Design a protein with these regions (language model features):
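Short beta-strand to alpha-helix junction loop
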Residues: 100-118, 214, 284-293, 319-332
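C-terminal active-site-capping segments
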Residues: 428, 432-524
Length: 524
């Protein structure tokens, strides 16, 4: 529970307890300016973090946070399916500037949502959020050094135009309005209910039902043990297995550090410990994939019933960390399988039937409820249509600069995190570097920064070089990355700390300019 000052009068208002959920939905009452220095798109964990760093490092700059939905929190407000939780520890997934105080390092969605909203309220960021405001397009004028941003009210449909010098896109990487569901033959014949986790009905009761979860990713391995507590039985149907590893829900050492060193210092030490641990695991898997596969298999076999077909259901055809490794707190998925409350089927769907699904092997799986945990619909840069001096920007023709800007697109930054570690570790560094860039621009007396690719023949590859299906479906619509810095997107936290936090901002590929129509650019 938070305590905010409300009201006016001579006493300056009264203290009123306000829940974190209420804070995340508090509307702005004062008139909002149509022109600001920075527009931050998205009021999720990345957008709130970006706002914190911006107002800390540049308190003189005006900004607003545009949120398309009616509440803050992003993913953690949108997803409401049973068991929703992080798959990274909160000491690294949380903000560097705000300690995670809960004893659970793998936390459920409600706790993470409260944490994000509390951070916004503590720093006054919640008062900068404009809810129900969807960004449709943004048009850049080099002569004015301004973006004209068209937004639409989700409540009235009214469209207005805002103006800013910078856009920081923190709206995530997937569509909020719909998840991905493949076309299943015969789906209309199924007499039960079919739901997607992204739009989970709050009144859905799975008690006593036969539940079929289609998928094998993080959402599926979260849902299965959560539903298995009350369902008659839960079956996870997967086309291809994923690597699944148990992790402790509570970090005993982190909790001891907090007790010994205090909240701030204990959190900082635990965060550093877990960063090093994540890096070590990823590097081991990259360098010794066969050994990593054997080790994971050994853990799986130990946690599953004797004689269980581990190789059939938990032995992917790719190496560890070619796709994201699924973490299950305290091995809850394996426990549900051991206890007979859940099972795994590895096969392909031939068609839906009236009572379940028919598999290509000829086997039938009966179900009362089918959950399609089949992934996301990726949407780069929040789906914003960008135009630079009258020319439309085609994302697939751009190359990512330092993992935060696009070649040829001035004064536009975005937040994309790690796929091999906690997402927000990278986002925090990008926010810091963005603020350093603004400081450098102030020192040089310029108001335009544009990455320019000096070598058009440089070999490129996909920006998100990741094997997950939801990425592969849209790979040709996303920006590219190069084969060298600063055009190569790094997955190395230590290297990014050096590049984004410590090395000079100036770079030959980053061109600076002024809005006074000067004919010559100011190069890095």
């Amino acid at each position: 529970m938070l305590v905010l000052r409300r009201g006016g009068g001579q006493d300056g208002g009264c203290s009123v307890p306000v829940s974190a959920s209420e804070v995340g939905r508090m509307p702005l009452t004062a008139p909002q300016p149509s022109s600001v220095d920075v527009l931050i798109v998205g009021a999720g964990i990345s957008g709130i973090g970006a706002a914190y760093y911006l107002q800390r490092e540049h308190p003189q700059r005006s900004y607003a946070v545009l949120e398309a939905r009616a509440a803050s929190g992003g993913t953690w407000d949108l997803f409401r399916y049973p068991g929703i939780r992080s798959d990274s520890d909160l000491h690294t997934f949380g903000y560097e500037f705000k300690p995670w105080r809960d004893e659970h390092s793998i936390a459920d969605g409600d706790r993470i949502l409260a944490y994000v909203r509390e951070a916004a309220a503590e720093h006054g960021i919640d008062r900068k959020i404009r809810f129900n405001t969807k960004v449709l397009s943004a048009s850049w004028s080099s002569s004015d050094a301004r973006w004209s941003v068209e937004v639409e009210s989700a409540e009235t449909g009214e469209r207005t135009t805002l103006s800013c010098n910078w856009i920081f896109c923190a709206g995530g990487y997937y569509r909020y309005d719909e998840g991905f569901t493949p076309r299943f033959e015969g789906r209309e014949e199924f007499r039960g209910q079919v739901v997607h986790p992204q739009h989970w009905p709050q009144d859905l009761d799975s008690t006593g039902k036969r539940v079929l979860v289609i998928g094998s990713g993080a959402t599926a391995v979260t849902l299965v043990p959560a539903l298995a507590g009350t369902a008659a039985h839960v079956t996870m149907l997967q086309r291809t297995p994923s690597y699944v590893m148990p992790v402790p829900a509570k970090d005993r050492l982190a909790n001891q550090l907090r007790s010994l060193l205090g909240e701030e210092r204990g959190y900082a030490v635990a965060r550093r410990k877990n960063i090093l641990q994540q890096q070590a695991v990823w590097r081991f898997c990259q360098k010794y994939p066969k050994a990593a596969r054997r080790l994971i298999r050994r853990y799986n076999r130990k946690l599953l019933p004797a004689g269980y077909p581990v190789d059939e259901h938990f032995n992917p055809p790719y190496d560890p960390w070619d796709q994201r490794l699924c973490a299950v707190p305290n091995g809850d998925l394996f426990r549900a399988i051991r206890e007979g409350r859940a099972s795994v089927a590895t096969d392909r769907i031939a068609r839906f039937t009236a009572t379940g699904v028919l598999l290509e092997s000829g086997r039938t799986l009966e179900a009362d409820l089918i959950v399609t945990a089949t992934g996301l619909n990726v949407q780069a840069m929040g789906g914003i249509e960008l135009t630079v001096d009258g020319e439309p920007v085609r994302l697939a023709d751009t190359v990512a600069y330092k993992g935060m800007m696009l070649s040829g697109v001035p004064n536009f930054a975005y937040a994309i995190g790690y796929t091999n570690s906690s997402w927000t570790l990278k986002v925090g560094l990008l926010c810091e570097h963005f603020c350093r860039l603004l400081t450098r621009m102030d020192a040089r007396g310029v108001d335009i920064a544009r990455p320019v690719l000096a070598d058009p023949a440089m070999p490129t590859r996909p920006f998100l070089d990741f094997g997950a299906g939801y990425i592969q479906r849209v790979i040709d619509l996303l920006p590219r990355q190069g084969d060298r810095a600063p055009w190569r997107t790094s997955l190395n936290y230590s290297g990014d700390v050096k590049l984004l936090r410590h090395l000079p901002v100036d770079d030959p590929d980053l061109h600076f300019d002024r809005s006074t129509r000067t004919p010559e650019a100011v190069h890095g």
